[in-house]
Amino acid sequence: MSKLIIAEKPSVAKSIASALGASSRADGFYEGSGLLISWCVGHLVSPMDAGGYDERFKKWRYDDLPILPEPFRYVLAPGKENAFENLRALMDRPDVDTIVNACDAGREGELIFRLVYEMAECRKPVLRLWISSMEDSAIREGFSDLRPGADYEALYQSALCRQKADWLVGINATRLFSVLYHRTLNVGRVQTPTLAMLAERDAKITLFHKEKYHLLRLTLDGAEAVSEKFTDPAEAEQAAAMCKGAAVTCTSVTKEQKKEQPPKLYDLTTLQREANRLFGYTAKQTLDYAQSLYEKKLLTYPRTDSRYLTSDMAETVSCVIHLAAKLPPFDGCTNFFPLVEAMISDKDVSDHHAIIPTMEIEKADIKALPLGERNLFLLVCCKLLCASAEPYMYEAVTATFDCGDHSFTAKGKRILAEGWREIDRIFRIFLKEKPVDGDGGTLPDFTEGQTFDGAEVSVTEHFTQPPKPYTEDTLLSAMENAGKDDIPDEAERKGLGTPATRAAIIEKLVAAGFVERNGKSLIPTKAGINLVTILPEPLTSPMLTAEWEQKLTEIAKGGADPDTFMDGILMMVQEIVSTYSCISEDGKKLFAPEKEVIGTCPRCGQPVYEGKKNFACSDRSCGFVLWKNDRFWTSRKKELTKKMATDLLKKGRTNVKGIWSEKKQATYDAAVILDDTGGKYINFKLEFPKRKVGADGRK
């Protein structure tokens, strides 16, 4: 008898087949060693669209809302019928007695497999392959420790709840507000509160009022001491005058030894954030690069929310660290003795451990990788080396001075042990990036009571700074914390989406026209801001959405009831539909298309706008309209263009070439003159160019 192994994509199936000795390639699967290995192509099975439940749902109408399928039905994804039929045929083979789910080890991978298994109506036993690396050794080890598929029932229920909740909120809210505002408005359970955070930040920037302030700067032995802020420039100048040339006394010197522990390893979100800061990569680009490196067996599983390793990995990671330390530019690090203990925490690893390089690093040609993958791979290597290095230790020095009855402060530091920052500095220099040294350079050796004569003082002007627009780096952080700042590293986070879905959420907002990229910044568009303005709090609140996400996590762990979760989603959808049945006239204008003014109405002086069929005065009571296909134009095989209409409104005439004469069966050129008598229809006259007089006096 044979086991059928189903992977999520062809490249993964190929790696599994190679590792397990299934070397014979057939049509749609590999075979060998008592195994059949095939693959999905992402989601083969999807929830049925609303129109599939009832013909009337194919049209978007308020009266049909809310649409609440019971039970949910599923269909094959368009274009993937052959892939599904191949899997169903393999499942039905009489020599197959067991199915192995080898889709990605996470919520979405579980859903991809289960929906195919259910639609194929397969009832054969299921085992689960759960691995965090595509290395041959990891695949073989995982296959020797297959777990019962039933162990992942809670994870499957969590995935189903996520999918159903997204469908219910997306279908009903999108149809509701699109019908009300006469424009397609895509509303999503997670993307809309993310948009709300962007809109809130944009509003803070718009409303920000900058304020001027001044600082006094005192120069002492090459060091600079700074005063408190002065909001009154005259007061600052007066203080500077008192200090210039006056004696300066050092009133205190404090020295404090400080220690910065090595950074933690990467989870997906922190990797995406740092890749955005250093390389400008979008969250999706980083995920794509990391996924490719995972499939090339160079990185461990990327869709993780853990920044720690498990205790059984200590020996392996120690070997990987020594291999990474041999790679340029890290081979220039000195006195490096890896400390693995700080990276180990079994309680902080649930499904997958932190992202690290694999043992394949020894055989890989890193220089041959595409630039994006190479940068990301070296970034992960750098983090692994930093995380296993000694702490960074320094002495923080603060010196205060008195001059002309004003206090000044100078800050500096003296490095005691560079520790992990040496590795970080070498990597940043390699990238031609400025090393992160923190505040303050080395101060002279000031002593309390020390005096200086003839103070040099300058006044500098400054302005308070507005909040900065979100970048993918800072937005990912906000999504992870549901917009709440100052959350301790060890606190339980209730975020928007998951590490695996946040990149797609950002891309959806951009694709829908609600967000634009401006360099590294993410800026909400007018349509995006208006959408957030009209939607109710349950759809825009980051904290409420994060609570839903937390409940999904609890369901996956077996700690919450799926039915209770779905009841809450259904209640929210029903309440939103019943609350919003009509909108004001002002509300309808929010999403009215912006019209270009092409001229001024000759009758009333109001703006004239272009419509689909005409150019009309914005004051409907005026009645002035230029029709694009007026009989005057169609009889002459012409259409009134925007340029022609602009000329008519500005100059009262427009020159037209190629006018058709039905009588002469030929074309001619002429000027068309606007002849408005104030009636319902506009009249036009033709004016022909005068012929030039020849030398003999003839025309």
How would you name each of these model-derived features?
Residues M1-Q163, P338, P466:
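Intrinsically disordered, low-complexity regulatory segments
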Residues M1-S2, A102-A105, H182-T184, K255-K264, ...:
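Conserved short loop/turn motifs at secondary-structure junctions
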Residues S2-L4, K80, M91, D97, ...:
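Basic, low-complexity terminal or inter-domain segments flanking catalytic cores
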Residues A7-E8, W39-V41, C103, V169, ...:
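Flexible glycine-/small-residue-rich
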Residues P10-A17, G34-V41, A77-R88, R93, ...:
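Amphipathic alpha-helical transducer elements in NTP-driven molecular machines
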Residues F72, P94, D136-L220, K255-K259:
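C-terminal or mid-to-C-terminal helical accessory/interaction module adjacent to the motor/catalytic core
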Residues P233-Y266, Q272:
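Metal- or metallocofactor-binding catalytic centers and their adjacent structured scaffolds
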